[in-house]
Each structure stands twice: as structure tokens, then as C-alpha cells.
Amino acid sequence: GAPQIRWRQPRWPGPASDFAVATWLPVFVEGCRVTMEPQRMIAIEGTKQIIQAHDYYTILPLIPQLVPHLRAALNTSNPPAVAAALEIVSLLLTEFYGAVDVLLECDGFRRLLPTPNTLSNCTVKVRVGYRTKIVGGEQKRLDVIIHETLSLMAEKGGVRGLRLIKSYVPTFDPGR
């Protein structure tokens, strides 16, 4: 079988209110560019836990600060880094109702879309997610990850979001 990691139940060492989210969340998001394990896992899982442990009012004002780090990860054109950045974008959009509005207002869609356009036909398998508790995560094709994230962005962004996506990724079909 595949090597596995022993997992503990995630919990903060103290109350979540004592954690400096504005300081640490951008650091963890910036770490999604890293492709070596276990640093990659720590960056991705740390980002997810911070986002899930805090509320709407704490995370939404930080989204404009996260966009440059996500864009830097996407601009590496390194499939694992691109997959990690898209996974974080998907998490933000699914966890918080107003995240898409913040992304549209801070021009996040426009800044995040050029790389998915260039890699939309990339069939490289990348390791994503650590829910399976297998070292490195489960494998998924990058083009599938890109399509799922763009579909979520189109669904949450409405007509304006779909129009922006179609302007940067002309081959995108949300019904596919």
C-alpha cells in the first residue's frame, strides 16, 4: 500500500480569536507555490484550516491580500502549484457566500484567469487534497481541476463572472 501519515484531529493550540489571521493566512497561501512535501501539505492544509476556523467577517477583508499570492502560484505554470492555488480559490468560493463579490470588486477574477487559460488543456496528473491521508494526496488531472474551478467561479459569479471568464478563457464551456 501507499505510505500513510498519522493524523491527529485538527485543533488550534488556543482560542481561534488569539490567532493573527491577517498575518498568517497570506503566508500560508504564499506557501502553496512550494512543490516539495511536507512543506506543500503544511501550506495547503494550514490555509484550509485557517479559512475553515474563522468566520466571514475575518476572511473576506483578507481576500484582496491573498490574490497576489494566488496569482504568483498560478504564474509559475507549475501544475502542482496551479492546482494548489485553484483549490484555495474553490475553498474560498464554497466557504463564504460573499467571496465572489470581493474577488470581482478587487479585480481578482481578471488577475487569476490568464494561467488557467494557458493550462486548460494540460492533462498532467497532480496530487491534490490530503483527505485520503495518503502522502502527497490523491491524483487528479490539471485540466479537470481547472474546469471545476472555472465552473464554480462562473456559477458563483453569475453573468458578470461568466463574461469575465469567457473573455480570458474563450474555450470554457460551463455545461461541459
Task: State where each predicted segment sits.
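Short amphipathic alpha-helical segments embedded in low-complexity Lys/Glu-rich regions
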Residues: 47, 133, 163-171
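Acidic, Ser/Thr- and Gly/Pro-rich intrinsically disordered linkers and low-complexity segments
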Residues: 120-142
